[in-house]
Amino acid sequence: MKLLELIEKWAIETPDQTAFVWRDAKITYKQLKEDSDALAHWISSAYPDDRSPIMVYGHMQPEMIINFLGCVKAGHAYIPVDLSIPADRVQRIAENSGAKLLLSAAAVTVTDLPVRIVSEDNLKDIFFTHKGNTPNPEHAVKGDENFYIIYTSGSTGNPKGVQITYNCLVSFTKWAVEDFNLQTGQVFLNQAPFSFDLSVMDIYPSLVTGGTLWAIDKDMIARPKDLFASLEQSDIQVWTSTPSFAEMCLMEASFSESMLPNMKTFLFCGEVLPNEVARKLIERFPNATIMNTYGPTEATVAVTGIHVTEEVLDQYKSLPVGYCKSDCRLLIMKEDGTIAPDGEKGEIVIVGPSVSVGYLGSPELTEKAFTMIDGERAYKTGDAGYVENGLLFYNGRLDFQIKLHGYRMELEEIEHHLRACSYVEGAVIVPIKKGEKYDYLLAVVVPGEHSFEKEFKLTSAIKKELNERLPNYMIPRKFMYQSSIPMTPNGKVDRKKLLSEVTA
């Protein structure tokens, strides 16, 4: 598969086909090619001997997709940075990545960034001034060069930049198109922010098949009336989201085949797909295929998949996450470093061309999580699971990293920033489950000196500080105040005791 060439061919074959829609804004494949070519030409002219990654800032604007392709055509990996990411985190991403340039599809509110900022108006000027110029195809990202870098939660308090190469992305996209039976010219839901790698599951399978990406932004999701009005207009055929988002949509009685009559495929990734959610979807969309998938950011979106049928639902209360893609393999490793037999739990290790080359600028973290097995890259996921008859079953995290509403986060990172807040002496984050999946985060806090008369005022003050340091999805929903944190005999936080206390 030649990824960029496949996307480019639609600009020739179906130039007026819509590539991306967001509210009232849309771009065709012709415009996508012309503007990304113009941008790539400008980047190559402005930075002729440089291959540093480029930050791309915004939310669901069509210019985000143009910027992504412009970067890689000029030989630079892109780093998607969503508007919701706090200034402090954006600053740390800029410093860690070594980026020299930030392309903005929206107003940048972060100050003192160590990068050159190209504003929305600057971009329009570049698209106009360099229109008709084509970049040298030899400059484009290829092989084991980084295509994109996505920053995920890190236990040290600093986000980790996961490097995904061109070859990684080709491996994923080829598998997704073939195994999920995606067709030419379909409409794909684009719900996940671009800084979340679930978005890759719809972006590139859509673009290489001449599809249309239909973007739903966070404001729509916060206003169900707007959300369902948009969905009714969309004619979506391929639905890509976390199970949580689909579960929220199912609360609306009209969310069914009558709203989306041409729905063909549901693709789920990012968290556990509950049996009851899949069952409701089959009832509402009897003609659609439901695919449950699994994979960490470090292995390029997903590496397993299974068609969830009524027979599968009847057979498994907790759904399997699927069979491994053909060019990769799964190993279940026991604590002693040996491979577990069929049916025995251990750590899921992914081997093959989907695996990242490591964390940008973090050799120690890379060495800890990545290795080589039989000459191939391998990633130690930290996820517990087992394989039975070729099917992978996921059993949660081995450490304190969890997935909440599709977002992966390390509890230690949240604790790190919580303990740095004013009025906090000590703190532990306890993830609270509802059924099979995590529902919310509870912060157990030992408060420092403060003058607040009411606990809710103290909580508001702490949350205000956290909002400056962490994305909204990492802010604990509830706070509990105690005089001390229980400890185990060896001096570690007794998380099991805490969990039993707060759920009693």
Swiss-Prot record:
Amino-acid positions noted as binding ATP in the UniProt annotation, renumbered to this chain: T152, S153, N292, T293, Y294, G295, P296, T297, D383, Y394, N395, G396, R397, K492
One of the GO biological process terms: lipoteichoic acid biosynthetic process
InterPro entries for the chain: AA_adenyl_dom, AMP-bd_C, AMP-bd_C_sf, AMP-binding_CS, AMP-dep_synth/lig_dom, ANL_N_sf, DltA, DltA-like
Cellular compartments per GO CC: cytoplasm
Annotated catalysed reactions: holo-[D-alanyl-carrier protein] + D-alanine + ATP = D-alanyl-[D-alanyl-carrier protein] + AMP + diphosphate
PROSITE patterns found in the cross-reference section: AMP_BINDING
Name of the protein described by the UniProt record: D-alanine--D-alanyl carrier protein ligase
Gene this chain is encoded by: dltA
